[in-house]
A protein has these predicted regions:
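Terminal, low-structured helical/coil segments at or just beyond the last alpha-helical repeat
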Residues: 131-161
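Hydrophobic face of amphipathic alpha-helices that form TPR/SEL1-like repeat modules
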Residues: 36-45, 68-78, 102-109, 138-144
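Short helix-capping/linker turns of helical repeat alpha-solenoids
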Residues: 31-32, 43, 62-65, 94-97, ...
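Sec/Tat signal peptide C-region and signal peptidase I cleavage site
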Residues: 16-20
Length: 161
């Protein structure tokens, strides 16, 4: 009896996950950016990274900021640094604080762009305004990590997506 219940529960959980994934995919096809993002996460969990990236791209194209951040993070993990900053910039433009923070860190450290604390500061300020505590830490004390002396004061260009 116990094995039967456990097996039934597993089938129900699997069916529920598949159903939710199907609902998100259908809603995504109808232009729901949040559904595209949620479907992308499900694809990522299933290790279907290509499909996940496609769904996240659709979410980003629909101006769903988390989809843009997902693409930025995946590109950065794949060492596509200049491309990751394009997606972080769009996430920031769509008022996702963590997108602003990620972009600011990359600009400050020179990941995908020339390093520039000066160019990073507006992104830290926006991250702070959007509630990201680390953004506020950089605004209050730009040198708080102690290794910023090597950074130039020049401007970094982040292309728009």
């Amino acid at each position: 009896m116990r094995k039967s219940f456990f097996f039934s529960a597993l089938i129900l959980l699997a069916a529920t996950g598949t159903h939710a994934q199907d609902v998100n995919t259908q809603s995504c096809e109808k232009g729901n950016g949040q559904a595209c993002y949620l479907a992308a996460i499900e694809m990522h969990k299933a290790k279907n990274f290509g499909r996940g990236a496609d769904l996240a791209q659709k979410a980003c194209d629909l101006n769903y900021a988390q989809g843009c951040f997902y693409l930025g993070f995946n590109n950065q993990n794949g060492s596509k640094y200049s491309q990751c900053n394009v997606f972080y910039k769009k996430a920031c433009d769509l008022n996702l604080g963590v997108g602003c923070l990620a972009l600011a860190n990359n600009v400050r450290l020179g990941i995908g762009v020339n390093p520039s604390l000066q160019a990073a500061m507006p992104f830290y300020q926006k991250a702070c305004k959007l509630g990201e505590p680390l953004g506020c830490s950089h605004v209050k004390n730009p040198g708080f990590e102690g290794h910023m002396g090597h950074l130039s004061g020049g401007k970094s260009e982040i292309s728009k997506h």
